[in-house]
Amino acid sequence: MKPLNYAILKHFTKIKGACADDVIEALKGEYGNFKAFNKNTVMSALMTAETNGLLEEKSFDMDKSGNLRIYYHANDEGAATINNYIKD
């Protein structure tokens, strides 16, 4: 099992884009019991990956509760970097 942050990054090499809620839904089967597996931690990981050039903002919208959802994607260079350092 990969560390949670690695799993989050690796997830973006297999999809076209996602927000924190999508990531949580996709990884909850494997990481749902982890204490650190929550929206704040996932959002922090996404923002850190964006700051480091691994992910880019793709779009944004509001959920039914009026909360902002930011969608990210891994561009070709970011995905290549992630795949180079984090193996399946």
Give the positions of each predicted feature:
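A short, conserved structural fragment
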Residues: E50-D61
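Hydrophobic residues on short alpha-helical segments
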Residues: N5-F12
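N-terminal positioning helix adjacent to the helix-turn-helix/winged-helix DNA-binding module
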Residues: M1-L4, N38
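Short, Lys/Arg-rich nucleic-acid/phosphate-binding segment
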Residues: S59-I70
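DNA-recognition alpha helix
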Residues: D21-N33
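Short, amphipathic alpha-helical interaction segments positioned at domain boundaries
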Residues: I70-D88
